[in-house]
Amino acid sequence: MVQSDTSKSPPVAAVAQESQMELLESAAPAGALGAQSYGKGARRKNRFKGSDGSTSSDTTSNSFVRQGSADSYTSRPSDSDVSLEEDREAVRREAERQAQAQLEKAKTKPVAFAVRTNVRYSAAQEDDVPVPGMAISFEAKDFLHVKEKFNNDWWIGRLVKEGCEIGFIPSPVKLENMRLQHEQRAKQGKFYSSKSGGNSSSSLGDIVPSSRKSTPPSSAIDIDATGLDAEENDIPANHRSPKPSANSVTSPHSKEKRMPFFKKTEHTPPYDVVPSMRPVVLVGPSLKGYEVTDMMQKALFDFLKHRFEGRISITRVTADISLAKRSVLNNPSKHAIIERSNTRSSLAEVQSEIERIFELARTLQLVVLDADTINHPAQLSKTSLAPIIVYVKISSPKVLQRLIKSRGKSQAKHLNVQMVAADKLAQCPPQESFDVILDENQLEDACEHLADYLEAYWKATHPPSGNLPNPLLSRTLASSTLPLSPTLASNSQGSQGDQRPDRSAPRSASQAEEEPCLEPVKKSQHRSSSATHQNHRSGTGRGLSRQETFDSETQESRDSAYVEPKEDYSHEHVDRYVPHREHNHREETHSSNGHRHRESRHRSRDMGRDQDHNECIKQRSRHKSKDRYCDKEGEVISKRRNEAGEWNRDVYIRQ
């Protein structure tokens, strides 16, 4: 066999290499079979040997190495790939620039609506924000002002806190997608729970706070849900244990407990739509409708009216707005039950009041509700109003008792009812039930406490970058002063048509008081009317003016409240301001006497010419006094409007 191979006379180097391989093969304990197989392999190799001694297999491996080198096609991107990557980067930068421009424009836009959050969101976890770093983080029960919709996943708005700027807010669709992704990751983590229980529990713990379970209990449904939180947190601990028996034992119990929990939270949205400005509601020290409570709250209303003049709307609500629960308004099957119950307010009336409160809040003015039926914070906890609850508290029951008894026998006979109501308010958890607690002994201190809170809230809702005239304010005030019929509109297009904005604007009273300061002559003529008006205002106990309240139950009566005084302005003006006309007449008589004296001094002149001259002067003075009266007529009318719209204190304090 060897002689037949060597007969081909291979080169010397190849023979030496082959002899070394044969020695190595013979040293291995392979036996005769191994030597025989090697001989066959040697013959197969020698068939593909080249002239330089290299085999064909070597050349093949070398070609493979050269294909995998850095010069190959696969390791170096082509020109088309580079251009595609550059196009994507350019598109991304352009989209980011447009998003930044839209964000800047939204700073000057009015607030479209407001929401209260039911979930926690951390912006650090997101990388698909339209403008990197401009997403807004928030906790549960925070409030957001939404300016506009950017796309399906993002809104543009801001967190209602002082110092927070505008940014991107995740939409409910995006939050729902995030929740589904977290659930999928949690399910995938269960496969590795038997090996690494600690890791799966920590990742699940990161998911849970951002889910709906972080919502503080604000209703009976939420209280039940959070009551099941502890049970559910204990049950997954057994699920994560490596013992298989624990799963079989606790799974029926866990299904029974977790089914109602997931059923309740399944319909809980991430956001609740609330008024753009949270309405302020006063409760305490006892029941409304009794003199002690009404007297103390009335003092606070008067203080707020003058402290925040031009920035506040105080409105009286007679409907039972505690019926405006989200579960009732969103469920038509419950409407019949409410209608059949012995409530003094229908659902249509309640819905109308809620819409009116939302409309008032769109102006971004402070909204204060004088709600007759609200005596406890739980009455509004399930509604969509999200009010600022102010608790007027008398710490000592004995002091409250003495106050009630001091109001007379008619109030003292209802002492027990008022004391029970005060005790129920005192039992409420203060941090969860009330936003402000006024427990000061002096009225001035309590007023300043409330004013400080509302000033901070005003700054939180009115950032410096967005302090521009609100078109919704003028639109709402203009719509509230529209007459009901065309005849009234035609009657009001005269001199009173110019005064319509002054009546609706909150600054009308101050403007009416500043107008006499412009011309001293006008002020001297109408000093008696100003004194009479001020005396009347002080006699009414600084009542709330109707221009800041909508104190009737239906929309028609609210509109008529703005129109009815307009019909009687001419008669009221004639009856009340007769002294002005007498004052002007005396002035006119005095001027005519002066002309007669001048006529006697110049009697030597032509009598006909003097008489013509005197007639011209008389007509001019009469015309001037008439114009002066017309100028003051607007002021007189505006004062009369404020006077006619003020509430009588005896009527306000309900017996």
Curated annotation (Swiss-Prot):
Q: What SUPFAM superfamilies does the database record attribute to this sequence? A: P-loop containing nucleoside triphosphate hydrolases, SH3-domain
In this UniProt entry, which cysteines form S-S bonds?
none
Identification of the protein by name = Voltage-dependent L-type calcium channel subunit beta-2
Query: Which regions are flagged for Basic residues bias?
Result: 593-604
**What residues does the record give for site: Required for CaMK2D-binding?**
544
- Organism of provenance: Mus musculus (Mouse)
* Family per similarity comment: Belongs to the calcium channel beta subunit family.
Write down a Pfam family by its short name: VGCC_beta4Aa_N
| Organism placement in taxonomy | Eukaryota, Metazoa, Chordata, Craniata, Vertebrata
| Function per UniProt | Beta subunit of voltage-dependent calcium channels which contributes to the function of the calcium channel by increasing peak calcium current. Plays a role in shifting voltage dependencies of activation and inactivation of the channel. May modulate G protein inhibition. May contribute to beta-adrenergic augmentation of Ca(2+) influx in cardiomyocytes, thereby regulating increases in heart rate and contractile force. Involved in membrane targeting of the alpha-1 subunit CACNA1C.
Quaternary structure and partners: Component of a calcium channel complex consisting of a pore-forming alpha subunit (CACNA1S) and the ancillary subunits CACNB1 or CACNB2, CACNG1 and CACNA2D1. The channel complex contains alpha, beta, gamma and delta subunits in a 1:1:1:1 ratio, i.e. it contains either CACNB1 or CACNB2. Interacts with CACNA1C. Interacts with RRAD; interaction may be involved in beta-adrenergic regulation of heart rate and contractile force. Interaction with RRAD regulates the trafficking of CACNA1C to the cell membrane. Interacts with TMIGD2. Interacts with CAMK2D. Interacts with CBARP. Interacts with CAMK2A.
